[in-house]
């Protein structure tokens, strides 16, 4: 069974939006992350303060191939490949809305999380109705 995750995409480190739009995927570090192929990963965009993308883990132990979108030197260890499933452009996934469904923000999303079932179910339902 696939798990759902929420991950924090930091604009100052990488231009994830551009990579997803141009490549159709991004690479995500395997360090301290336990994704499995088939898992769903929602991306909270640091600059927009909202969840904007639904991605799916399609491979692991991949070389980093999105280096052109990085603003800092990324670690070059193996990565997961997260393929774009859908972009959300509405306002139901803004930070203020997410807080109403259990989002803690701040340091709680330094590493991907999957244990907030209420929040992840809400995010998934918004993508499904869009």
Go through each PLM region and give its residues.
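Short, basic/aromatic beta-hairpin or loop at an interaction surface
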Residues: 8-23
């Amino acid at each position: 069974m696939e798990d759902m995750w929420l991950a924090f995409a930091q604009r100052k480190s990488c231009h994830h939006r551009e990579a997803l739009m141009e490549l159709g995927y991004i690479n995500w570090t395997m360090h301290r992350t336990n994704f499995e192929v088939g898992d769903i990963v929602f991306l909270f965009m640091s600059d927009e303060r909202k969840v904007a993308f639904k991605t799916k883990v399609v491979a692991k132990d991949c070389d980093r191939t999105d280096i052109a979108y990085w603003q800092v030197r990324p670690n070059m260890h193996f990565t997961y490949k997260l393929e774009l499933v859908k972009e959300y452009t509405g306002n139901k996934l803004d930070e203020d809305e997410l807080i109403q469904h259990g989002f803690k923000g701040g340091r709680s999303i330094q590493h991907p999380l999957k244990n907030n079932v209420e929040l992840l179910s809400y995010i998934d339902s918004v993508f499904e109705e869009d």
